[in-house]
Amino acid sequence: SSIIKPWVARLRPTYDPELMFQIRHISGRAGQYGFVSSHAANTFAVATFMSLVFKHRLTTICLLVWASVIGYSRIYLGVHFPLDVLCGAMLGVLVGAFVYMLQHFVHAKFAFSHQQSFSSAYTRSGFLRDDMYIVLTALALTLVYTLV
């Protein structure tokens, strides 16, 4: 998104001459340009990648809620227009899916084949459930912190 922002040169709401005095912003204005939202792109890339890796419904829901709350916070804080966040989210989904496919290709090409015993301690994709709970706990705490 750092490449896209100066190329598109769309002002953030806090820099838009028609809106800048109508928006109450909490902190500094950040950079001058806001299209696309880097926060939305990054969080949706992480959410997409982790959802594809873990293949666990509850984790996917939590990740999407987490990324959506971060995206909404950018609009609420007045640093992005809704379209900035939406396009950032779409970019993030594309990047997350691409990185997953790349990781899957590299893993299939260069990883040693090993047989993993599957039990109730593992998810369908082979991850320890305890690791999933750590991820879910971190997401929940981040979400609570964001909302408070």
Model-derived segments and their meaning:
Residues I23-V148:
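Membrane-embedded catalytic cores of phosphoryl/pyrophosphoryl-handling enzymes
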